[in-house]
Amino acid sequence: MTELKNDRYLRALLRQPVDVTPVWMMRQAGRYLPEYKATRAQAGDFMSLCKNAELACEVTLQPLRRYPLDAAILFSDILTIPDAMGLGLYFEAGEGPRFTSPIKSKADVDKLPIPDPEQELGYVMNAVRTIRRELKGEVPLIGFSGSPWTLATYMVEGGSSKAFTVIKKMMYAEPQALHALLEKLAKSVTLYLNAQIKAGAQSVMIFDTWGGVLTGRDYQQFSLYYMHKIVDGLLRENEGRRVPVTLFTKGGGQWLEAMAETGCDALGLDWTTDIADARRRVGHKVALQGNMDPSMLYAPAPRIEEEVATILAGFGQGEGHVFNLGHGIHQDVDPQHAGVFVEAVHRLSTPYHQ
């Protein structure tokens, strides 16, 4: 494999010295870029874009042509696993993802297959291999999956939700059915991420988008327990390098200590958590990724730079910080503002690494 020309993202995740703080953006390949919209129109629809390795590679590389980002992230969706399990994923205009056959009972769970990542999800692995080839060692490639809990919310609710009453009803009235589903999902995610690593992903991230809707006790039992199982089952070395693992629970700032106990290398922070506080609490165990409010990118350039400076100062001197937004970039952000953000991170972080 090609030697990595820029490995500062991987080094920062392992709390090793870097010259400047590395930066990438969640959803950096996305609808805020006109070139993304053009490629998506060419594909026809979102899942066709995900399933075409050449086009998925093209949109993965688009933000790297605009900005000096320190990592590429696979263009895919967290719902590829439930789709491969046969739930009938489709996208409703203005509604987001929906499933034709949501999970309603333990009997439904028992019927679910565990997808073979090189068969039913082979299109994802083809995309990983294509992107790695086209990156030519410029920056590392991040692979990812949704967490078992987050995937289960979509599978049981039948799509996006605001109150999560359907899955919480299952959690409190039929916990054994939900545990059976989460167990299957944990196995599926482990296989899926390991296949991404073998195909060329140099770091992986688990997105627990909806863990923050749980009580502390339920988070431990129904979300973190299964992420811990996945971390235990992941390949941690490939191509002679450690493959760092990042866990990200949106709204999970109060559980960082428990998350750091899983054996992951880094924790993602949303913008509601103070990064200085997070470093005091868990910085001796894990790297931290984050955590500017994505809405800050609507601000004028000086305000964006001021916010970058504040977060860098909050983390302070030394290693173990990957700069990112606290969640995905919004689709109506001016691409020039994203450029201001990336440039500011590199320029303003130099003194913190001397």
Swiss-Prot record:
Keywords: Cytoplasm, Decarboxylase, Lyase, Porphyrin biosynthesis
Presence of the UniProt keyword rRNA-binding in the record: no
EC assignment: 4.1.1.37
Single GO cellular component term: cytosol
SUPFAM superfamilies the record matches: UROD/MetE-like
Primary localisation category: cytoplasm
Family designation: Belongs to the uroporphyrinogen decarboxylase family.
Primary role: Catalyzes the decarboxylation of four acetate groups of uroporphyrinogen-III to yield coproporphyrinogen-III.
PANTHER family linked: METHYLTETRAHYDROFOLATE:HOMOCYSTEINE METHYLTRANSFERASE RELATED (PTHR21091), UROPORPHYRINOGEN DECARBOXYLASE (PTHR21091:SF169)
Name by which UniProt lists this protein: Uroporphyrinogen decarboxylase
Annotated organism of origin: Klebsiella pneumoniae (strain 342)
